[in-house]
């Protein structure tokens, strides 16, 4: 496994699945797991502290509400942690975003956008990180970016179908 995708609860999976979908597109192996910072703190500590020795290179952590999962995962590992704020009902994910982005100096979490765009971009960013040491992954990322460009160039007029 190259990427660990963790989330605070099973209800976060519909959002976090977009990270997995992007990794699938780039041929990057991953594992998924529910690891709650509040309900299973020891599981979180064990998961994050053992990730490197298990071959994980990047952790994508999605959480809503108080959203302590990404920061706590980062506290237990030296691996890059990408935080995805999962949209919440009460504050539409702003609470999650602020919880993830406001990390103390010395414990870094790369924070993505709220919700589905953030999860998809976390998958892309993880592939880009891995691609710095794996040309086959980087080639797939570059092909994806070129495809996006071609799609826009092929349909420049929004009034046309």
UniProtKB/Swiss-Prot annotation:
Entry EC number(s): 5.4.99.18
Cross-referenced SMART domains: AIRC
A single MF term (Gene Ontology): 5-(carboxyamino)imidazole ribonucleotide mutase activity
Gene Ontology BP, a term: 'de novo' IMP biosynthetic process
Signal peptide stretch: none
Pathway: Purine metabolism; IMP biosynthesis via de novo pathway; 5-amino-1-(5-phospho-D-ribosyl)imidazole-4-carboxylate from 5-amino-1-(5-phospho-D-ribosyl)imidazole (N5-CAIR route): step 2/2
Function recorded in the entry: Catalyzes the conversion of N5-carboxyaminoimidazole ribonucleotide (N5-CAIR) to 4-carboxy-5-aminoimidazole ribonucleotide (CAIR).
Similarity comment text for this entry: Belongs to the AIR carboxylase family. Class I subfamily.
Protein name per its UniProtKB record: N5-carboxyaminoimidazole ribonucleotide mutase
Designated gene of the protein: purE
